[in-house]
């Protein structure tokens, strides 16, 4: 189900990361990052593949050492999706990552080094057709900006961003994506809104950094990124969670799906239950969700606890069930198509899902 009036999108310059387009009106790109030892190429590749299966269009991998660089070469060669090298402190590792096959670099203005080192990275990336994300972070700003007491945190993030974008573009390098991350949602909103106004042509990578554990991080990311995306701001996104990285892409896709920006797999519509509910709805909804998780068809599936929330309120669902005492009424777009016993609800609903997909 998409919005009848699509959300406005700021038209930024297109940047290509391997075969994936960021900006220029392309769909919002979903990213995540591995947490394995990059020197262990096979373990990292296993996680990259799991992230791709979970919905990542691009995956970022940290390259902190020379040993990691060797593993990174294998990862780039065998990955099913474009790989981004995350670089801090050592510009030579950035150059090595380009040579190893990185589709994009992420560098941090606060620790990459002086302009000569930055220029060496720009030149290497330019020669290889490798994109670069200028990844500004509130916790590691350049010292001269961090010490400015007359600036707010969002203003500091914007100042660092503008400085680096200008330097890159003055050098003729325009294959850039920009991020300005903080753990505060309010700071994130102010910074990205300002960047969208001040540097409207550069694609923006959205994220709330250090967002927290699964529940807290999901809430903060959904609020911060959802607001920005609803305003047409953002070309790619990463939901950061203190959790298995595979937990991140479904949250990102959920945000995009909630706004009607992208669809991936079924959307589950289920009620919170009340005194009218006469079945144990929670495990039914959970089982339906679990059994649908590997389906790719963009269907709307409703699991409702009573007739009030059934075919009427969920009439736009492709398929659904309205549960009553010991039974469930199956419906499609508001029309009853069958009645089943309570213990057969999930199997019957899944059979109808499979039938609908086969018919399509």
Where are these regions (language model features)?
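N-terminal amphipathic alpha-helix/helix-capping segment at the start of soluble metabolic enzymes
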Residues: 1-33, 126, 290
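Active-site mouth loops of central-metabolism enzymes
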Residues: 25-43, 62-64, 81-89, 144-158, ...
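Conserved, mostly hydrophobic/aromatic
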Residues: 30, 86, 134, 178, ...
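Glycine-rich, proline-tolerant flexible connector loops at the mouths of alpha/beta enzymes
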Residues: 33-41, 52-76, 106-114, 176-185
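Glycine-rich phosphate-binding active-site loops on the catalytic face of alpha/beta enzymes
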Residues: 57, 100-115, 231-245, 323-336
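Alpha-helix-loop-beta-strand connector modules within alpha/beta enzyme cores
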Residues: 66-87, 120-132, 194-202, 288-292
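Hydrophobic or amphipathic alpha-helical targeting/insertion segments
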Residues: 92-133
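Catalytic alpha/beta core domains of metabolic enzymes, predominantly
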Residues: 136-137, 145-296, 300-303
């Amino acid at each position: 189900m998409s919005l009848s009036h699509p959300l406005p999108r700021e038209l930024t310059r297109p940047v290509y990361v391997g075969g994936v387009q960021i900006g220029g009106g392309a769909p919002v790109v979903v990213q995540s990052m591995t947490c394995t030892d990059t020197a262990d190429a096979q373990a990292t590749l296993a996680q990259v593949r799991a992230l791709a299966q979970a919905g990542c269009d691009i995956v970022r991998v940290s390259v902190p050492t020379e040993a990691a660089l060797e593993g990174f070469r294998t990862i780039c060669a065998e990955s099913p999706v474009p790989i981004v090298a995350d670089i801090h402190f050592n510009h030579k590792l950035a150059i090595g990552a380009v040579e190893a096959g990185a589709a994009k670099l992420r560098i941090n203005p606060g620790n990459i080094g002086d302009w000569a080192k930055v220029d060496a990275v720009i030149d290497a990336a330019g020669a290889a057709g490798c994109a670069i994300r200028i990844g500004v972070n509130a916790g590691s700003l350049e010292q001269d900006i961090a010490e400015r007491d007359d600036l707010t945190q969002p203003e500091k993030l914007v100042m660092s961003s503008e400085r680096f974008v200008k330097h890159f573009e003055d050098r003729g390098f325009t294959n850039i994506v920009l991020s300005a991350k903080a753990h505060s949602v309010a700071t994130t909103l102010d910074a990205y809104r300002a960047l969208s106004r001040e540097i409207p042509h550069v694609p923006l990578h959205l994220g709330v950094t250090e967002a927290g554990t699964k529940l807290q991080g999901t809430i903060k990311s959904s609020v911060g990124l959802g607001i920005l995306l609803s305003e047409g701001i953002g070309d790619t996104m990463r939901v950061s969670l203190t959790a298995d990285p595979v937990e991140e892409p479904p949250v990102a896709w959920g945000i995009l799906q909630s706004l009607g920006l992208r669809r991936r797999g079924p959307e589950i519509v289920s009620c919170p239950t009340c005194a009218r509910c006469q079945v144990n709805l929670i495990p039914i909804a959970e089982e339906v969700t679990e059994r649908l998780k590997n389906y790719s068809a963009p269907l709307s599936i409703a699991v409702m606890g009573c007739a009030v929330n059934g075919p009427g309120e969920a009439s736009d669902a492709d398929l659904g069930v309205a549960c009553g005492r010991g039974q469930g009424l199956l419906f499609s777009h508001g029309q009853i198509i069958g009645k089943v016993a309570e213990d057969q609800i999930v199997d019957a609903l899944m059979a109808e899902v499979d039938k609908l997909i086969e018919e399509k």
